[in-house]
Structures are given as C-alpha cells and as structure tokens.
Amino acid sequence: QEWKERMRASITDTGNALTDSEIIGLSRELDMEELLQYRNCVGRRTREIVTNLTPDDMKRRVSPVQLEQILKEGGVTKQEESLWLLDYWGQKDVAGLLLMPPTRHVILHLNDCCRWKEWIRTRKRKI
C-alpha cells in the first residue's frame, strides 16, 4: 500500500485487463521516480529470494492456496483478461516462473509496442 501511494498508482493488479487508454492514463499518473525505486527494491528482494532457492524449490509448483492469496490481495482481478494468469501460474514450477519474464514475457509485448509506435507515427503525420 505504501508503494502504491508513493507511485500514485490507481491499481494493484498486473494490469492485464487494462485497455490501451487505461494504460496511457496509468502511465500519465505514475510518479516515474518512485516507480524506478519500486522496481529496484523488487529486484533486490527477488535476488535475495532466488539466491536462497534450492534445486527442490525450483521444481515446486505454486499451490492453490498461494494462487487464491494472489487474487485475495488484488494481484489479479476477477476479469477474464486477468484471471487466466492464475491458471497459467498454477501450471508452472518455480523455475518456469523465473524464466518467463526474461524470455517469453518481453516477446508478448512487442506487438503492442509496434502497434503503438505506428499509431504515434500516424498521428504525428497528421499534425
């Protein structure tokens, strides 16, 4: 809650159910300096956790209780565009979850980035 206020974020979930205009609105309202500080803190804490994982931990799947906790705490919403993440995460082991962001996750967003870039270019030509 403290970080949410510091960043001036209006959401606590992953943002998967946001529309393009909601993403733009969120981007405008966020305090980018605080967002960078948050990212750095998350990175440090993640490194601490990962450093202490054992080989057996890497094979462990996320439990239904943990998935329910994510929903309860607002990490995902009950919207279909957000809720599917719980099913996805529930099918992965810890190793798969750790590999997803630096590998597949970035690729998922490339199409959106290209589409936004083209929209911005088209808009600039009209001005």
Predicted regions located by residue number:
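A short, structured beta-strand-centered segment in the mid-to-C-terminal lobe
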Residues: L26-Q37
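Domain-scale activation on soluble regions of proteins
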Residues: D57-V65
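Alpha-helical segment that forms one wall of the substrate-binding/catalytic cleft
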Residues: R39-V42
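A conserved mid-domain beta-alpha-beta active-site/ligand-binding segment of alpha/beta enzyme cores
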Residues: E22
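Short, contiguous alpha-helical
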Residues: Q1-L18, R44-T51, P64-I127
